[in-house]
């Protein structure tokens, strides 16, 4: 039975075969998926995906409105649409 900290499903199980032929389980942190834009579903550039706990908040995503949520092209379209709507 693994120790209680390793029973959690937040850790991914990797089966490793040793030179002796014995198979053991190694526990690793799960990898994060690539961040995608909420509108066009393209992958976001400038958003880190690995070991997020090691980075500060400003390093994890771009420092702009909707950074880490929308890509730059969708953001420009959104800003233009809101400005045009305000002018009417």
Curated annotation (Swiss-Prot):
Keyword Ribonucleoprotein: yes
Cellular compartments per GO CC: ribonucleoprotein complex; ribosome
Keywords from the UniProt entry: Ribonucleoprotein, Ribosomal protein
NCBIfam families: PRK04059.1
Pfam families named in the record: Ribosomal_L34e
Gene3D superfamilies for the chain: 6.20.340.10
Superkingdom, taxonomy of origin: Archaea
GO annotation, biological process: translation
Name of protein: Large ribosomal subunit protein eL34
GO molecular function per UniProt: structural constituent of ribosome
Family the UniProt entry places it in: Belongs to the eukaryotic ribosomal protein eL34 family.
Coiled-coil positions: none
Species of origin: Saccharolobus solfataricus (strain ATCC 35092 / DSM 1617 / JCM 11322 / P2) (Sulfolobus solfataricus)
């Amino acid at each position: 039975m693994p120790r209680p900290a390793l029973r959690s499903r937040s850790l991914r199980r990797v089966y490793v075969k040793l030179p002796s032929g014995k198979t053991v389980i190694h526990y690793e942190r799960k990898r994060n998926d690539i961040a995608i834009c909420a509108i066009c579903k393209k992958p976001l550039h400038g958003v880190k995906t690995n070991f997020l706990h090691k980075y500060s908040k400003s390093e994890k995503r771009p420092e702009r409105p909707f950074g880490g949520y929308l890509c730059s092209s969708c953001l420009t379209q959104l800003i233009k649409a809101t400005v045009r709507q305000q002018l009417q």
